[in-house]
Amino acid sequence: MSNIILSIESSLDCCSVAIYKNEYIHSLSEKCKKKHTTHILPMIKEILSQTKTEFKELNYVSFSKGPGNFTSIRIAASIAQSLSISLKIPIISVSTLAIMAEKTFRKYKQKDVIVAIHAKKKQVYWAKYTRNKNSIWIGEYTESLLEKKIIQEKIENLKKRWTLVSDQSELIEFQNILNVKKNYVFLPNAKDIIPFVLLKIKNKNKSFSIENNINYLYNQF
């Protein structure tokens, strides 16, 4: 029997959960700005019910580690850690920006992706990710918090054309740069955490701790 994986995503203004079971991904998603606390646990119970899964059957738990809002990331991290400890199962965290890159590939088959998340004032958290032939996203080392004008300069200096994705339409202002061929606005989804977890399981890269593994952006709430 294949592994059963629970994933949780609550880093921005949307809550989502997913279950990987019998090689199929089941997911739920809701917009829940400032109300993550009241949404996440009921959604987890609902997805378990829909998939006829009990907590004790879970083999792995995973969550989005940010960047994102302090409070909402902490909620997902705390739930994931509690499940990891109580069930004695590994916990795996994935970058929010990488999750958005994976969603871009799932929906649009784009492999060279610039991800931009609004931070505050004129700052943006950004990264450029490339999916290689082994389905691995390379680019977490590029994640940084920068001024918009600096990001524009970086994009203009890239040697190939990229797809731009963001959580807010105002950041699509970068679309007029010649190196940007397509642009999309959306929020991350828990179902796009699953491919990362499957790769880490395959490579035997797993952990039972979240220490030094969370990337807080700022406390919006």
Swiss-Prot record:
Subcellular localization: Cytoplasm
UniProt keyword annotations, A-Z: Cytoplasm, tRNA processing
Domain of life: Bacteria
Primary location: cytoplasm
GO cellular component: cytosol
Keyword ATP-binding appears in the UniProt entry: no
CDD domains per the UniProt record, alphabetical: ASKHA_NBD_TsaB
Xref: Pfam families: TsaD
Keyword RNA-binding: no
Any one GO BP annotation for this protein: tRNA threonylcarbamoyladenosine modification
Similarity comment text for this entry: Belongs to the KAE1 / TsaD family. TsaB subfamily.
Function: Required for the formation of a threonylcarbamoyl group on adenosine at position 37 (t(6)A37) in tRNAs that read codons beginning with adenine. Is involved in the transfer of the threonylcarbamoyl moiety of threonylcarbamoyl-AMP (TC-AMP) to the N6 group of A37, together with TsaD and TsaE; this reaction does not require ATP in vitro. TsaB seems to play an indirect role in the t(6)A biosynthesis pathway, possibly in regulating the core enzymatic function of TsaD.
Name used for this protein in its record: tRNA threonylcarbamoyladenosine biosynthesis protein TsaB
Organism whose genome encodes this protein: Buchnera aphidicola subsp. Acyrthosiphon pisum (strain APS) (Acyrthosiphon pisum symbiotic bacterium)
